[in-house]
Amino acid sequence: MLFRSPDFDFESYPTCHLDPDIYEDIDDRPVDWVPAFGQWGVAATHLDKSCVDVGDIFLFYGMFRQTEIKNGKLSYIKGAPIRHIIYGYMEIGEVIKDDKEIASKYNWHPHSIEPFYTNNRIYISKKCSTFHYDDALVLTQKDQPRRSVWQLPSFFA
């Protein structure tokens, strides 16, 4: 289940946005929307130094905790651990580094606005998807209280 918190004041945080933006049906989308991932500043420099380019694949992970619907409301299960879990991927189809091109061609993406104009990138997807939960996607080592202690899935071997 994916949703935006109705309690979060997005207007007060204009640079807060979906990134990666790979969920086609989460918002009303402009007709020219494509899945994309924006990076800027130090993160963009790190990706450049790592030679990340067309054809490479990003694996996306986040912190997740098991939930349940109680009395019609979604809530966390008491005592359920917070774990790092892979939730999606994106194969890079194009890398846009020119701010003017980003602003004109991808004006719907938050990285097209001025705060992101220093060392800015948008990675356009060739192919992407999200995953349904599977134990094989859990990065946090089983029975480990610290979520940052990982046991990499076998497909990393």
How should each PLM-predicted stretch be described?
Residues 73-157:
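Aromatic- and Lys/Arg-enriched surface recognition patch
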